[in-house]
Amino acid sequence: MTVILRPGSVPLSDLETIYWTGAPARLDAAFDAGIAKAAARIAEIVAGNAPVYGINTGFGKLASIKIDSSDVATLQRNLILSHCCGVGQPLTEDIVRLIMALKLISLGRGASGVRLELVRLIEAMLDKGVIPLIPEKGSVGASGDLAPLAHMAAVMMGHGEAFFAGERMKGDAALKAAGLSPVTLAAKEGLALINGTQVSTALALAGLFRAHRAGQAALITGALSTDAAMGSSAPFHPDIHTLRGHKGQIDTAAALRQLLTGSPIRQSHIEGDERVQDPYCIRCQPQVDGACLDLLRSVAATLTIEANAVTDNPLVLSDNSVVSGGNFHAEPVAFAADQIALAVCEIGAISQRRIALLVDPALSYGLPAFLAKKPGLNSGLMIAEVTSAALMSENKQLSHPASVDSTPTSANQEDHVSMACHGARRLLQMTENLFSIIGIEALAAVQGIEFRAPLTTSPELQKAAAAVRGVSSSIEEDRYMADDLKAAGDLVASGRLAAAVSAGILPKLEN
């Protein structure tokens, strides 16, 4: 199903659909007239003699050099090819598709001055599955994501490399195989394609979507751990959280209550339990995971604005003037990425502490050491917990802010930059680590629940436990564990663990 984009009002849900499903996207036809009007204005400037940055001048520090009208097409070609300086591994197809959709949205606002031909080619590439090879490194997040977006633009011109039908090939070959033709860029079109924050924004959105999916799964594993440790649900009482007032905390507590409702394990110790309070990793889940949820929701609002923004330069304004500005500076995206990193780090940190609690007989209220059937002969989940600690610590290091690390570039013309691109890209590794941490907690918590037999957990959590056991059987004795950890992490990453419980329980990303 094709996602129809209405630039300026594209909802987060449409972007998430493109990311998770690979759905093609195209602009609503109602925006064609605005695009064509701006393109006509650029053509007028080319026909005249007045120098206008990015149209008939050089770029960056070379902006004072006037370009003859006969060289305008060559200028655009040279711009793209000279800026194809990315290094590192190719970005994955889901990221590149999102980048292309975001570029459509920006161009569709009618302020970039590109021809409809250019827009139609991007739409066709998405529809046919021509995915430009974009190296992951090379952007400092201002003046836009120049190098990575140049690799996208190069394929549109028949240069560079692309993936098509599962094969890596030259850009012109990929277009030909898909029945498409390369475009010759007109005035300003090269700059419009590469001068934007779409790579940083796509990476940040991917980090956001993955972090939220992990956060939803963490509520399930947190509830399972609460029951496995025979923890109290009293700290999730709604009045406690209403008195504080944070929406994420209130929603998180409500989800935990619903997940634990009807648990025979909980009912068995609701009276006469000599423990007065649980450790913070059980008791303070609403406060910690709720704060993370609030942070992700705030970031979601920022990135929705950025996804709908025009981040090109110069811009064709509503009065038909062409004005240079700085919308290419990705500082909002850099801040958003740093905030997502904090949330990812903390969701994993409190999950890891619950894993540590479950494997420690001094804390787990009757569970065997390391959740092993015969501790000593078997090591159980001893080293799985160590792995979770390693991943947690790695995420702590990766969570350090990228946005504060500016450096001047381009002969000091671009003297302050955002570092949004790598700040957002590290979220992919951080969320991959988080999926594994939560997967390990799922294994530990379900194993702990089984040790409480004949008592069982709640109906909702039984469904989640069944999903875990669908990919990893009960650990009766020590075995090769890497496959179990991968399967559990994949269960979280795919969204299948979150989908195992009834719809409407887990908090949504948008308020």
UniProtKB/Swiss-Prot annotation:
It catalyses: L-histidine = trans-urocanate + NH4(+). Keywords: Cytoplasm, Histidine metabolism, Lyase, Plasmid. Pfam families: Lyase_aromatic (PF00221). CDD domains: PAL-HAL. Induction: By histidine. It is an enzyme of class 4 (lyase). The modification 2,3-didehydroalanine (Ser) is found at residue 143. There is a cross-link at residues 142-144 (5-imidazolinone (Ala-Gly)). It is found in: Cytoplasm. Contains an active site 4-methylidene-imidazol-5-one (MIO), which is formed autocatalytically by cyclization and dehydration of residues Ala-Ser-Gly. GO terms for molecular function: histidine ammonia-lyase activity. The keyword Transport does not apply. Coiled coil: none annotated. GO terms for cellular component: cytoplasm. GO terms for biological process: L-histidine catabolic process to glutamate and formamide; L-histidine catabolic process to glutamate and formate. Its main location: cytoplasm. Pathway: Amino-acid degradation; L-histidine degradation into L-glutamate; N-formimidoyl-L-glutamate from L-histidine: step 1/3. Its EC number is 4.3.1.3. The keyword Cytoplasm applies. PROSITE patterns: PAL_HISTIDASE. NCBIfam families: hutH, PRK09367.1. Belongs to the PAL/histidase family. HAMAP family: His_ammonia_lyase. This is Histidine ammonia-lyase. The gene is hutH.
